[in-house]
A protein has these predicted regions:
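Hydrophobic transmembrane alpha-helices of multi-pass small-molecule transport proteins
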Residues: 115-135, 262-281
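Transmembrane alpha-helical segments that form core, pore/gating elements
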Residues: 18, 44, 137-196
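C-terminal-most transmembrane helix of multi-pass membrane proteins
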Residues: 239-288
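Hydrophobic/aromatic residues within transmembrane alpha-helices
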Residues: 23, 32, 36, 80, ...
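Helix-helix packing/entry segments at the starts of transmembrane helices
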Residues: 89-95, 170-183, 218-253
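Loop-to-transmembrane-helix transition segments
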Residues: 1-9, 49-78, 144-152, 192, ...
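C-terminal transmembrane-helix exit sites in multi-pass transporters
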Residues: 97-119, 245-264
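Membrane-interface helix-cap regions at the ends of transmembrane helices
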Residues: 41-59, 128-140, 184-206, 277
Length: 288
């Protein structure tokens, strides 16, 4: 099942976050977006030329929508991180699977098709696991940050839906990611020049962080695009929660972050929801 590529995406996104955290002391946010995207352009264009593929597409506007919405979603999430505790911001950002489920429910109701209550329940269960792991908290004066994080989750779901539409148009995953990285390159560079005062020096001490971040980001985006573009949207949404598990494990192994009992219970809940969603989807696909 193509949706299982989401597990690969979650792993690489979590590993990318490790490199971002290590390089954050030397580079600004827009600068990291620029280097991450630029390396993706170089890697993917090299792959495209070596295989004799083409970047020409009749769906250029669709690629622009996916890239623009996805980049805006990422940007306002970064902004929400400056206004909210990390756990709260991430929890609200991970409402995107809930929004995707809502889109699917509306479409199925309009088409008068049967509702996949089992998968929808797994997504809700997985989100409950995310809440247990991240343990969000609010205080007065954080409404703007909460709205931004929630908007990021909504826009993220719209971007994922756009990936699904491009996949249905037979656009290959590498082309979808290529245009996303091209957009991110210009966006990151302009943001850096106007808001961060220019690029920081690259040294032997920090270049490894950039390379690791760029390779992981490219692999993660390709995997995510395969999952949403060619897989089951609801299953991919549910498996997206696995990124929370992998991020916690990365924090444990690389930074010595301790796991509380509540976190461990939340991880177990996310794992159960993912396994159940996979089994339900496989059973549905094997029905005559």
């Amino acid at each position: 099942m193509k949706s299982l590529w989401m597990l690969s995406a979650s792993f690489f996104f979590s590993l990318m976050a490790v490199f971002v955290k290590m390089g954050a002391e030397d580079f600004g946010t827009f600068e990291l977006i620029f280097y991450r995207s630029l390396a993706g352009v170089i890697l993917l264009y090299t792959f495209i030329r070596s295989r004799g593929y083409t970047i020409r597409t009749p769906y250029l506007f669709g690629h622009f929508k996916r890239s623009f919405i996805g980049t805006v979603s990422m940007s306002i999430w970064f902004l929400s991180l400056t206004m909210l505790p990390v756990g709260t911001s991430m929890t609200l950002n991970y409402t995107s699977p809930l929004f995707l489920s809502s889109f699917m429910v509306v479409i199925l109701l309009m088409r008068k098709q049967p509702m996949p209550w089992g998968l929808l329940s797994c997504i809700v269960l997985g989100f409950c696991g995310v809440v247990l792991v991240l343990q969000p908290s609010f205080s007065s004066g954080q409404m703007l940050g909460a709205m931004l994080a929630l908007a990021s989750g909504f826009l993220g779901s719209v971007a994922y839906w756009q990936i699904k539409e491009l996949g249905q148009l037979k656009e290959p995953s590498w082309r979808i990611v290529f245009y996303f990285t091209v957009f991110g390159t210009f966006y990151g560079l302009l943001g850096n020049l106007f808001l961060e005062g220019g690029l920081s020096p690259i040294t032997l001490d920090n270049i490894g962080y950039l390379i690791g971040m760029a390779v992981c980001a490219t692999c993660a985006q390709c995997s995510l695009t395969l999952a949403f573009g060619q897989g089951n949207v609801l299953l991919s949404s549910c498996l997206q929660f696995s990124a929370i598990i992998m991020a916690e494990l990365m924090g444990l192994f690389f930074f010595g972050d301790a796991l509380s009992l509540t976190t461990e219970i939340g991880i177990a809940v996310i794992m159960v929801s993912g396994v159940c969603a996979t089994m339900l989807t496989r059973r549905q696909q094997t029905k005559p």
